[in-house]
Amino acid sequence: MFELDHLFVWVSPGGPEADHLVAAGLAEGEPNIHPGQGTACRRFFFRNAFLELVWVRDPAEAQGEPTRPTGLWPRFAGRATGASPFGLALRPSHPGNGPAPFPGWEYRPAYLPAPLAIHVATGVPASEPWWFYLGFGRRPDDPGWPRPQSTDHPLGVQEITRVRLAGPGLGQPSAAARAVAAAWQVELVEASGHAAEVTFDGGRQGRAADLRPVLPLILHC
């Protein structure tokens, strides 16, 4: 069994777009950098998962080894010309290095202690999200999380319960995309442009916030 670990969105350097999530009623968590990968992020934590706004802070690192095979740099650089601005990570429902739900390879960035690795899906076009699996992943409200983060938000949301991803080619998705959709509450929809609809708590408040065009996100709570 699998769960959503987090959804990321490529944004401008410094992540000023995160301010729009704050204005929508989300409380920002601790930011992070990824040494050796050339990226940094601003994050928003919920009980079961988190949203991450990521940018490239060091193009040389992002294009060097061992990051180059991930394709992260061309995705960041091409986000305005057709590449998907999203990445989506799954994790096992219970902590532990269980098998991934899709074929892939083990990416071992410098910021992860051995033997931890990120399982990156193969056979995925740049028009689809960057699918990956964290066998070591945990819920943000798990006592074993490395650095505890607040999951309280003025908007009153608690958990991400569904993600709907729209984009070119998602009507005929890759094998990895189909595996992700089968593993958790991820819906894939064909569309001319990229967007993600994130539903919190089953949408019980009956409210929505469309953050486009600043962010390709629609929040339902």
Q: What are the language-model segments listed below?
A:
Residues M1-C221:
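Amphipathic alpha-helical "stalk" segments
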